[in-house]
Amino acid sequence: MKIVLLGPPGAGKGTQAKSISNKYSIPHISTGDIFRKNISENTPLGIEAKGYIDNGQLVPDEVTINMVKDRLQQDDCKVGYLLDGFPRTVAQADALNNFLVDKNEQLDTALLIKVPNEFILERMTGRRVCPSCGASYHVKFNPPTNEGKCDLCGSEVIQRKDDTVETVKERLDVYQKETQPLIEFYGEKGLLSEVDGTKAINEVFRGICELLGNNK
C-alpha cells in the first residue's frame, strides 16, 4: 500500500502515521527524517541540501525528489510506504507519479486529514509546556491542576513561540497555499480520500482504516 498523507499543522498526522505504519506494516517516511539522515551521513545529496540551507535558501525540488526516490528504492519500501511531508508541490507530485509509472506502480491514495482552521488554532494556541521537565498541557483539554503551574515540578508553564496565534496563522496560510493545488491534483486523479480530523484520535484512526480497508 502506497499512501501520501496530507493535513494541516496540528492535525495529528504524526500520531496517525505511526498507527497506519504499525497496522499495515509499511514504513512511515518523513521528509524531515530523510533530510536529517542525508545531511548527518554527508551523502552527496545531503551535502548539496546543506549548502542551500546554510545559505538561507530553499532546497530545490530536484534535490528533495532525488532524496525521496533513493529512500523509496530501499528494501523496506517493497511492500509499500506512507509519505509524510512529500509531495509539497504539484511539481513534486508529478515527479512521484512519473517515478511510480516508470516502475509500473501506482499510488493507492492521498489521505487528507481535514481539520478547520479555527479548530487548529484552538488546539495549537492552547498548548503549554513546562520548560523545566518537559511536561505538556492544554489550557482547555488538559489543563494543569494549579493554573499555570506544572503538576510534576511546580514550574510555570509557557507557550512555545511556534504556538502563538500569529505563528499558527502563518503556518496555516503557507499550508493552504501549498496544499490546495495538491488536493486538486489528487482529486482530479480520483486518488483523494478524506477523514474528519476533529474527532478523538482513535475515532480518526478508525475512519482511516475504513477508507484504507484491509489492503496491504
UniProtKB/Swiss-Prot annotation:
**Keyword flag Cell cycle:** no
- Pathway where it operates: Purine metabolism; AMP biosynthesis via salvage pathway; AMP from ADP: step 1/1
Q: Which reaction does it catalyse?
A: AMP + ATP = 2 ADP
- Positions bound to AMP: 31, 36, 57-59, 85-88, 92, 160, 171
Q: What broad class describes the main subcellular location of this protein?
A: cytoplasm
Question: Which GO annotations describe the biological process of this protein?
Answer: AMP salvage
Please give the SUPFAM superfamilies that the UniProt record associates with this protein: P-loop containing nucleoside triphosphate hydrolases
Q: Where does ATP bind?
A: 10-15, 127, 136-137, 199
Ranges where the record places region NMP: 30-59
Q: Please indicate which superkingdom the organism of origin belongs to.
A: Bacteria
Q: Quote the CDD domains the UniProt record gives.
A: ADK
State the EC number(s).
2.7.4.3
Question: A single Gene Ontology molecular function, please?
Answer: ATP binding
Region entry LID, spans: 126-163
Q: Name one Pfam family in it.
A: ADK_lid
The record's subcellular locations are: Cytoplasm
Sites binding Zn(2+) sit at 130, 133, 150, 153
Query: Which residues, if any, are the signal sequence?
Result: none
Quaternary state and partners of this protein?
A: Monomer.
Known function: Catalyzes the reversible transfer of the terminal phosphate group between ATP and AMP. Plays an important role in cellular energy homeostasis and in adenine nucleotide metabolism.
Which family is this sequence assigned to?
Answer: Belongs to the adenylate kinase family.
- UniProt name for this protein: Adenylate kinase
Q: Which organism is it from?
A: Clostridium beijerinckii (strain ATCC 51743 / NCIMB 8052) (Clostridium acetobutylicum)
